[in-house]
Amino acid sequence: MKRLLTIQDISCVGQCSTTVALPLISACGVECAVLPPALLSNHTAPGFTGWSFCDLTAELGKVEAKWVEQGIAFDAFYTGYVCESHIDPILSIFKTCAKPGAIRIVDPAMADNGVLYRGFAADFPSKMARLCRDADYLLPNLTEAALLTGLEPKLSGYSKGEVEDLIGKLHGLGVRNVVLTGVSFDDSLLGTAVSDGRTVAYDFNPREPRSSHGTGDVFASVFAGAILRGKSAAEAAALAADVVCAAI
C-alpha cells in the first residue's frame, strides 16, 4: 500500500481540509498520513462569522526531525490550505521525507469567486507560487490560477483560449500536470481542464444550482487517491468530479 502525506489545516467544523482528505484517501486504498500546520475552530467560508486559529508552524520541524530519525518517508505529498509561514517547512519535508520518485500534488487553496479567502494578504499568491513550482500535479480553480500567474481574476466568461493561456502560464512555473477546476463555456455545465503540457482534455458535468464549501477539498482528495492507485490525471479528475457531484 502506498503512503501519502497530506499537509493542510484541521478545521474542527466545516467538512473541509484534513477532515475530508483522511477518510477519502483512505477509502481509495492509500495510507494517508496527516500533518496539520494549523488548527482552526471552523471553516473560514461565508456562513461562519469568525474562527480561532492555532498556528502549529513551530511543530513542523520537530515532526520532520522525528520522521527523518526513524526513516519515515512518503510516496506522495498532497498540500491544501496552508499559510505563508508553513511554506518553507513544507518544502523542506518534500526533500527530507520523500521516497525516490515521490509525487507532489498541490491544491493552492487560497481563493475563489475572484477573491482571496479571508485572512490572506494581497501578496500571498506570490508566496504560494513557491510551493507550486515543480509540482507534479497542480489543482487550482480559475481564480487561483489567475492570481498565481499575476492576472486579475474574472468571475466568469473565460474563453477556451483564455483557459489554455492560463494553463500555459502555470506550466511556466515548472508544473508538470495542470488540473484546472471551475471551467465552464456553457452556463449549464461545469468541469475541468487537464493538461500535461502537450494536450488539454476537458470534462464537464451538469452545474449544480447551489454552492457548497469543501467541494474543492473533496475533489483534490479523491484525485490524489486515484493518482496513487495508478489512474491518469484525466481519469483521476473525472472520477473526482463524479464523486463531488454525487456528494452534493
Where on the chain are the PLM-derived regions?
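Conserved phosphate-binding/catalytic region of the ribokinase-like
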Residues: E164, K169-I248
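Conserved N-terminal subdomain of the carbohydrate kinase-like
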Residues: M1-V106, M110-R118
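Conserved active-site and cofactor/substrate-binding residues in soluble primary-metabolism enzymes
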Residues: C16-V20, D55-K62, I72, S85, ...
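Fold-independent oxyanion-binding glycine-rich loops
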Residues: I7-I10, P37, G80-V82, D107-A109, ...
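Conserved phosphate/ATP/ADP-binding segment of small-molecule kinases
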Residues: R118-A201
